[in-house]
């Protein structure tokens, strides 16, 4: 089968012919119909998430097939699989655990001490076929097609969890930083659907700002043309926002947007751009604000976002479908900030 693999750090991904794996036990072989392209794939190709090196610090073994946003049809099942059959159209939660560590036992498998992350340290979906280590991490699709479903397994599950952590309700105001990207447009939709909160979207390109507006943001700010803090003070009548979801965590965003928080506000940190956080500790105490990390999502988050999408309440903003051979071009688009919404590869 054809597979697009990371062979050498910092170099273009390599299109290779490799064998089709055979599922055994609880494993499932999926014929990939759609693979979303995520900014994490940029970091993987670069070989680091900030200062964390994927090989030396995170234990990734090369070569590895990238692609963690996965949807497709079941081709074959192992002898321990129940409830699924060949031909079923499924989406796959790629953030899987080995099942025995403390975090797996409390239902937070995405924090597993020995994770099985497809497209990171296990072969992913930039290929014609992919092995799912355990069938319990699949969702049988009923209304969505594969292209619509694939981005939900990362951009959807990640922002669903972040919105949950933001503790929103109709009295609250949320600021989404990076609101026009694949994650940002999902965060806006999810927050609107589940909380009724007022949503402010901020981005730095006019087309991204327009995407955030189309996703349902009540207010949008172009930070390259407006003073974002002044606009936030105007919108909130000087109170500030009750929560920020920062999908970048860059030096720029972390130097600006914590200042947008109201008292008792939450700063939910999602992005992996690699900046350091510098904030005067007494201000945290005096305003009772919180900085909260949010990493992808667990099985409950996966089920939540899939049901929300199948009910028609949220929909990934797919801006481009591309061939498997164009994986490097798709990642280049993300790295150079040329992508709005989500790109999806079709093997």
From Swiss-Prot:
Binding site for Zn(2+) 1: 38, 68, 154
Top-level taxon of the source organism: Archaea
Residue positions binding Zn(2+) 2: 98, 101, 104, 112
Top enzyme class: oxidoreductase
Single Gene Ontology MF annotation: zinc ion binding
Note accompanying the cofactor annotation: Binds 2 Zn(2+) ions per subunit.
Cofactor(s) demanded: Zn(2+)
Residue numbers bearing the N6-methyllysine modification: 11, 213
Pfam families: ADH_N, ADH_zinc_N
Enzyme Commission code: 1.1.1.1
Catalytic activity: a primary alcohol + NAD(+) = an aldehyde + NADH + H(+); a secondary alcohol + NAD(+) = a ketone + NADH + H(+)
Subunit and partners: Homodimer and homotetramer.
Family: Belongs to the zinc-containing alcohol dehydrogenase family.
Name assigned to this protein: NAD-dependent alcohol dehydrogenase
Native source species: Saccharolobus solfataricus (strain ATCC 35092 / DSM 1617 / JCM 11322 / P2)
